[in-house]
């Protein structure tokens, strides 16, 4: 059985060795809930990787947003390069859920845009769980949403072996049942084609395609091939082909499901008619019968997930199958930034339920649609035998349920918690400007957090007028643009960034020496003990880190936050003194803040975002792939994307020292 193997230039240091030891022992002794209280910059991800390697169990890591999940995924791949590290987040680039607004009599149809590359990574994640145990899946909270039944999915797996006798027409039928589409012209993900005695399949979870060559009904050869160039690569003795969709249903189950849906429809129509809701009854009858007709003819309909309870043969009210059900029973759960992730998991069920209830009440959906939902928090916990919560500021749930809290307060660099100062609000802007100028003179950076958007905008404008290179970071800035702005802060394009609630978890900004918190004494979500500690942590990566809180009184949250920072700083100072350590500022390549995300973005966005390869043949192959994508984009009327790809092709041709127009 393969084991986890850490590959790193670094050894465990600071508080990391004792944290790994305690957490691993806790897992071995059967502790159900543990917390790793780790400060910013203490190497929590490296600790997690070492705990996983020590206990050698399949692991699910949940992060509360896609950006942090991408960072974690990239870091885990670096620490565990010989193991299966996978990425599982929502595959929607855009998602508008189905909804009805009774006050306006307005029905909003479901609208979505699926990212094929992310869907491929999701399929790769579930495939890994069926084939090996040395698996780490980094996921967002989308992992608690419905997925196909694991055993049904497994029953559709198609094993192929060199020398095996297998009628070709049966293989084709199996592929269609597995939701693969036959297309002899457009050979892309989730499709297959047949040319004479040669069958080519593009699995839903792989970059490479497969060629299966027959001699009569015998499989003569299996080989992987590059789907763009057609180049044959490695020979394969045997392989399992997994379904192209997570929701796969046999013909028998589909027939049973249709009967079950018809029975539910009859019962629901009687209820609505008895209540005098004739319009709702007529609407439900028309919509459901149309869906049933589509399912009978095509085995699928728009919004088929709303019938998932019937298709899976589940009882009313029962929990859906999710990614958690694909893991073996002894899997380990790690919840990153648990103070944010756990409340998010808890809130998913209620929000989904309220929207669906309106659709059911007004005849847009059958009551069984309520069972197409995320797990409730209790259902989620029931599927987890052992969990580790990771946070610099554990929330109430972690504090109450953890049987062991392991602290990781000492940084490998010896850096201390920032020095804190409380200043009055009178004259705060002038004082802040002076503090900013001191940092700018030393080529250091500043983060300023306010309570309102208006205040942030005004302050940013004022600082710009005063000659300070400032940028305002607001909630409407998308993830990748936000990363660019933070990168520009590190590069010195800006010296100051002003924001509201955007300066907290997951920011790696070693150049920031000052964090200024305005209206620190306004109790609330943005100025709670947790929020203050997280915000202060942004200055903890600089050797001269300082936090200034502008307030007219010291609130309970402020006092508790300051007491905790002082406690941590004392532990750090004592450790440094005992081990004769001088704090060292972090010198991290500027690209690092962005590169971790960029590498995953390239992986999940498409070939036009990939970096330029170094080998000429790889550049030529990428050009060929891009030209295919460009034609496809133009055919789909995606002209902006086609133009973007065209520009990238011109760049690559220049790299090959070929005239952009292709003239030699």
Swiss-Prot record:
All copies of domain UVR, residue ranges: 620-655
The keyword Nucleotide-binding appears for this protein: yes
CC annotations in GO: cytoplasm; excinuclease repair complex
Compartments, record wording: Cytoplasm
Domain of life: Bacteria
Ranges of residues in domain Helicase C-terminal: 428-594
Keywords attached to this entry: ATP-binding, Cytoplasm, DNA damage, DNA excision, DNA repair, Excision nuclease, Nucleotide-binding, SOS response
GO biological process: nucleotide-excision repair; SOS response
Motif (Beta-hairpin): 91-114
CDD domains: DEXHc_UvrB, SF2_C_UvrB
Family matches, as Pfam families: Helicase_C, ResIII, UVR, UvrB, UvrB_inter
Binding residue positions for ATP: 38-45
PROSITE patterns, per the entry: HELICASE_ATP_BIND_1, HELICASE_CTER, UVR
Keyword Cytoplasm assigned: yes
Domain Helicase ATP-binding: 25-412
Family: Belongs to the UvrB family.
Quaternary structure (record): Forms a heterotetramer with UvrA during the search for lesions. Interacts with UvrC in an incision complex.
NCBIfam families in alphabetical order: PRK05298.1, uvrb
Free-text note on domains in this protein's UniProt record: The beta-hairpin motif is involved in DNA binding.
Function: The UvrABC repair system catalyzes the recognition and processing of DNA lesions. A damage recognition complex composed of 2 UvrA and 2 UvrB subunits scans DNA for abnormalities. Upon binding of the UvrA(2)B(2) complex to a putative damaged site, the DNA wraps around one UvrB monomer. DNA wrap is dependent on ATP binding by UvrB and probably causes local melting of the DNA helix, facilitating insertion of UvrB beta-hairpin between the DNA strands. Then UvrB probes one DNA strand for the presence of a lesion.
Protein name: UvrABC system protein B
Organism from which the protein derives: Dehalococcoides mccartyi (strain CBDB1)
Taxonomic lineage of the native organism: Bacteria, Bacillati, Chloroflexota, Dehalococcoidia, Dehalococcoidales
């Amino acid at each position: 059985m393969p084991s986890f193997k850490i590959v790193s230039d670094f050894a465990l240091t600071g508080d990391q060795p004792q944290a790994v030891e305690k957490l691993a022992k806790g897992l071995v002794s059967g502790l159900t809930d543990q917390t790793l209280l780790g400060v910013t910059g203490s190497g929590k991800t490296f600790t997690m990787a070492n705990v996983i390697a020590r206990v050698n169990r399949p692991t699910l890591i949940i992060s509360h947003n896609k950006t942090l999940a991408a960072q974690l995924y990239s870091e885990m791949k670096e620490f565990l390069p010989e193991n299966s590290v996978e990425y599982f987040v929502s595959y929607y680039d855009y998602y508008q859920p189905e909804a009805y607004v009774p006050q306006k009599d307005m029905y909003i149809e479901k609208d979505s845009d699926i990212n094929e590359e992310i869907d491929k990574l999701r399929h790769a994640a579930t495939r890994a769980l069926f084939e090996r145990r040395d698996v780490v899946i980094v996921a967002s909270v989308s992992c608690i949403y419905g997925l196909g039944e694991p055993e049904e999915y497994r029953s559709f797996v198609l094993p192929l072996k060199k020398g095996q006798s297998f009628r070709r027409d049966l293989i084709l039928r199996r592929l269609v049942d597995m939701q693969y589409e036959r297309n002899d012209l457009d050979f892309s993900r989730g499709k297959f084609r047949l040319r004479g005695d040669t069958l080519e399949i593009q699995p839903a979870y792989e970059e490479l395609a497969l060629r299966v060559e027959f001699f009569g009904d015998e499989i003569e050869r299996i080989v992987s091939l590059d789907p763009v160039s057609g180049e044959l690569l490695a020979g394969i003795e045997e392989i399992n082909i997994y379904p192209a969709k997570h929701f796969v249903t046999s013909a028998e189950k589909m027939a049973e499901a249709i009967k079950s849906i018809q029975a539910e429809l009859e019962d629901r129509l009687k209820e609505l008619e008895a209540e005098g809701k004739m319009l709702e009854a007529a609407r439900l009858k028309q919509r459901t019968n149309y869906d049933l007709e589509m399912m009978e003819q095509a085995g699928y309909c728009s919004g088929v997930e709303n019938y998932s309870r019937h298709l899976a043969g589940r009882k009313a009210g029962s929990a859906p199958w999710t990614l958690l059900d694909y893991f073996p029973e002894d899997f380990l759960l790690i919840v990153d930034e648990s103070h944010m992730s756990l409340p998010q998991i808890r809130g998913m069920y209620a929000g989904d339920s309220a929207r669906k209830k309106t659709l059911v009440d007004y005849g847009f959906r059958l009551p069984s649609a309520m069972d197409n939902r995320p797990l409730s928090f209790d259902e989620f916990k029931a599927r987890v035998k052992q969990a580790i919560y990771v946070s610099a500021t554990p929330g109430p749930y972690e504090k109450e349920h953890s049987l062991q809290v392991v602290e990781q307060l000492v940084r490998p660099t010896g850096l201390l918690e920032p020095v804190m100062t409380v200043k009055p609000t009178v004259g705060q802007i002038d004082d802040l400007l002076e503090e900013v100028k001191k940092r700018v003179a030393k080529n250091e950076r500043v983060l300023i957090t306010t309570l309102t958007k208006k205040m942030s905008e005004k302050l940013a404008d004022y600082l710009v007028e005063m000659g300070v290179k400032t940028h305002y970071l607001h909630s409407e800035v998308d993830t990748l643009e936000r990363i660019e702005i933070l990168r520009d802060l590190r590069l010195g394009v800006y010296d100051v960034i002003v924001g509201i609630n955007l300066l907290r978890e997951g920011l790696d900004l070693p150049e920031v020496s000052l964090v200024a918190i305005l209206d620190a004494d306004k109790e609330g979500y943005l100025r709670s003990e947790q929020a203050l500690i997280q915000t202060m942590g942004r200055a903890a990566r600089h050797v001269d880190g300082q936090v200034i809180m502008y307030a007219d009184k010291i609130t309970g949250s402020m006092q508790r936050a300051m007491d905790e920072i002082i406690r941590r700083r004392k532990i750090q100072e004592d450790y440094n003194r005992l081990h004769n350590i001088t704090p060292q500022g972090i010198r991290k390549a500027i690209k690092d803040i962005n590169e971790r995300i960029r590498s995953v973005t390239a992986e999940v966005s498409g070939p036009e975002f990939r970096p330029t390869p170094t080998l000429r043949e790889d550049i030529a192959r990428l050009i060929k792939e891009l030209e295919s994508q460009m034609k496809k984009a133009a055919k789909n009327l995606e002209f902006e994307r086609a133009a973007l790809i065209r520009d990238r092709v011109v760049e690559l041709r220049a790299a090959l020292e070929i005239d952009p127009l292709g003239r030699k």
